[in-house]
């Protein structure tokens, strides 16, 4: 009896897990959806942070908060619905690169 109750509890808990807890490659549409949900905001923060942390070309200045980074990405997704079918990481990087462009290197002599 105890085993069947535990199994039923496990099955129910798996069904009620938020969908943003799943590991998957997401599109801009899905990330935009998460941007709109208050309870998914921590996911957005983590996602955007991972984009910045894994990019060799991110030029985010010191002092910029994770909230600011998430706002930039979420605003970009809101303003560009025609691009939201692309993968979210590429869109997030593009949004951050547009808002925080890297300084231009001097021309080689």
Labelled PLM ranges:
Residues 20-22:
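Signal peptide processing junction and immediate N-terminal pro/mature segment
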Residues 10-12:
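Hydrophobic helical h-region of N-terminal Sec-dependent signal peptides
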Residues 24-76, 90, 95:
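Short N-proximal segments of mature Sec-exported proteins
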Residues 82-108:
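Short, compact, well-ordered microdomains
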Residues 30, 108-109:
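A charged, solvent-exposed segment within the mature domains of Sec-exported extracytoplasmic proteins
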Residues 1-8:
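Bacterial N-terminal signal peptides that target proteins for export
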Residues 16-18:
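N-terminal signal peptide c-region/cleavage motif recognized by signal peptidases
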């Amino acid at each position: 009896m105890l085993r069947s109750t535990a199994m039923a509890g496990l099955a129910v808990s798996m069904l009620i897990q938020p969908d943003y807890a799943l590991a998957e490659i997401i599109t801009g549409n899905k990330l935009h959806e998460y941007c709109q949900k208050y309870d998914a905001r921590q996911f957005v923060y983590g996602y955007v942070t991972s984009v910045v942390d894994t990019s060799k070309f991110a030029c985010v200045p010191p002092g910029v908060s994770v909230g600011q980074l998430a706002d930039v990405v979420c605003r970009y997704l809101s303003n560009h619905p025609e691009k939201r079918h692309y993968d979210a990481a590429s869109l997030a990087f593009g949004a951050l690169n547009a808002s925080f462009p890297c300084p231009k290197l001097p021309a080689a002599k």
